[in-house]
Swiss-Prot record:
An example molecular function term from Gene Ontology annotations: magnesium ion binding
Main location: cytoplasm
Protein name as catalogued: 3-methyl-2-oxobutanoate hydroxymethyltransferase
Recorded catalytic activity of this chain's protein: 3-methyl-2-oxobutanoate + (6R)-5,10-methylene-5,6,7,8-tetrahydrofolate + H2O = 2-dehydropantoate + (6S)-5,6,7,8-tetrahydrofolate
Pfam families: Pantoate_transf (PF02548)
GO BP terms in the entry: pantothenate biosynthetic process
Gene Ontology CC terms, in alphabetical order: cytoplasm
Family according to the record: Belongs to the PanB family.
Positions annotated as active site in the UniProt record: E181
Comment on bound cofactor: Binds 1 Mg(2+) ion per subunit.
Protein species of origin: Shewanella sediminis (strain HAW-EB3)
General function of this protein: Catalyzes the reversible reaction in which hydroxymethyl group from 5,10-methylenetetrahydrofolate is transferred onto alpha-ketoisovalerate to form ketopantoate.
Keywords: Cytoplasm, Magnesium, Metal-binding, Pantothenate biosynthesis, Transferase
Length: 264
């Protein structure tokens, strides 16, 4: 199979083909996800919670992400690999450049940053220097203490308009992908239709161009709180590779996410 690139995902969007993404942190799981057809793998700062046992993502370091990016890179042949920029690793454009370079050298194809208007200059500088950017709007977990918890964003008209405006500005700044997390499905649909670049949803309804989940949720091995937007595919299939295929098939057919996994 041909390698997935940002151009591939753009073509999928133009053709109306839904694509799938998962988090991954090691070579073995990454290889399984890659070979079963997951299009995008994210070395997420979610590792702070699902691997390291923290209450949030804030303790994760650039070194943590780089280590796991190298591990995942060794396990994949096809999937596009995105690495999260962890908390405060891109507070300035100079920091962003240094840390994004380290993650690209670790094997990432793209880096992901959380935030809106304040990031526009950083996004432009990274893309101008050959570092592709995936942006992240809505519930941005690194800002959990500002939000007062893991809460749905964009439910009132003012915040919905702000998120839409930020999405358009981020695209204009040069971002090649956008993740929207925990926003009302109608808002996610509006954003996906308004942008040329592909939009990946998590807890954002079925009308985004792609879907992403945390691998621990898909495999039913998360401890503690289970997000409403997640689905345990291993429970219904009994085998890891079958679970991944079921996830891919349900996204392609528009079955997942259903109303039980969506906010309005």
């Amino acid at each position: 199979m041909s390698k997935i690139t940002s151009s591939t995902l753009l073509k999928f969007k133009q053709e109306g083909k839904k694509f799938t993404a998962l988090t991954a942190y090691d070579a073995s799981f990454a290889s399984a996800f890659d070979s079963e057809g997951i299009d995008v793998l994210l070395v997420g700062d979610s590792m702070g919670m699902v691997l390291q046992g923290h209450d949030d993502t804030l303790p994760v370091t650039v070194e943590d992400i780089a280590y796991h990016t190298r591990c995942v890179r060794r396990g994949i042949k096809r999937s596009l690999l995105i690495a999260d920029m962890p908390f405060m690793s891109y507070a300035t454009s100079e920091q962003a450049m240094t840390n994004a370079t380290a993650l690209m050298q670790a094997g990432a194809n793209m880096v992901k940053l959380e935030g809106g208007h304040w990031l526009l200059d950083t996004i432009s500088k990274l893309t101008e220097r050959g570092i592709p950017v995936c942006a992240h709007l809505g519930l941005t977990p690194q800002s959990v203490h500002v939000f007062g918890g893991f809460k749905v964003q964009g439910r009132d008209s003012d915040n919905a308009q702000r998120i839409l405006d930020e999405a358009k500005a981020i695209e204009a700044a040069g971002a090649q992908l956008l993740v929207v997390e925990c926003i009302p499905a109608p808002l996610a649909k509006t954003i996906s239709e308004a942008l040329t670049i592909p939009v990946i949803g998590i807890g954002a309804g079925a009308d985004t161009d792609g879907q992403i989940l945390v691998m621990h949720d898909v495999l039913g091995i998360s401890s503690g709180y289970i997000p409403r937007f997640s689905k345990n595919y291993l429970k219904q299939t009994g085998e890891i590779r079958e679970a991944i295929r079921a996830y891919i098939d349900e996204v392609a057919q528009g079955i997942f996410p259903g109303s039980d996994h969506t906010f309005n």
